[in-house]
Amino acid sequence: MAAAQQLARVGHHIVVLEKNDRIGGLLRYGIPDFKMEKIHIDRRVKQMEEESVVFKTNQNVGENVKPDDLINEYDAVILAGGAEWPRDLPIPGRELDGVHFAMDFLPLQNKVVAGDKFEDQIMATNKHVVVIGGGDTGSDCVGTSNRHGAASISQFELMPQPPESENKLLAWPYWPLKMRTSSSHEEGCDRDWSIATKSFVDDGNGKVKELIASKVKWEDGKMKEIPGSEFKLKADLVLLAMGFISPQQKILDLFNVEKDQRGNAKADTEGESSYATSKNKVFAAGDMRRGQSLVVWAIREGRQCARSVDEFLMGKTTLPR
């Protein structure tokens, strides 16, 4: 959307394709309403429509949209999808009912808030919830579970507990390593660090009833289980929120673009062909190019990519970098 608006403002005809039934991607379906109300997305979409941007929903590349058709019909194509390939936890019991990816849980809740109805909605009501993963997505699972009325909520993180404040001499230019407590955590949650989940236990009917985990310690960047630290924890609902590996590979493969070592679309951010992929006329920005990251990075890269596309099409550009 950031790239689309910039390009529309310098006179290009822009079409935005969205695979879901509403515009907004991960902003709409990945972030809970208590964290970001969707009125902000709706307002921006309306603004962009008045600037002549065309939005099309239910457009799924590889299903009802062919990459070759896009390349032939348009002068440039920007791949700007989110990093949606979640990191899995391949341990015994992973297949049990009640063990879900966070991104199977959160989007459903957002759709319900928007007025949709589902027969098989994943609910945390009166359940003992365990969230595996200590990042922002895990925090969103905690907040959503609290709003469902969970019986208990525990959140596990594999890495050690960070310090209360960062080391100022070592932080820049990296993301400061320090303890972070969100409003979701403050609403109620038991948090623990250096925890490795070993298996999920079947209740005899194909549903998870508890998990088995242990404490670990880290030495020289390697994880070691602490002998005698194994424990069991009741769990009716387990949410896997351990980050994302890369964008969905299907789209990148269909466009036949070169990838980097992490499975993202390979494209430089500097030089004459910045944000251009190995495929002529095809550009990539945001999570599709850099992997899992923050909304602000997606906006920045979208705006920079728009400049590169404008220069590619017109031979020059007045868009800011």
What are these regions (language model features)?
Residues 138-143, 148, 279, 288-320:
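A conserved FAD-binding loop/helix module that cradles the flavin
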Residues 124-135:
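Beta1/beta-strand and adjacent pyrophosphate-binding region of the FAD-binding site
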Residues 79-80, 101, 131, 240:
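Redox-cofactor binding/interface segments in oxidoreductases and associated redox assembly factors
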Residues 1-61, 87-94, 104, 138-185, ...:
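Beta1-alpha1 glycine-rich phosphate/pyrophosphate-binding loop at the start
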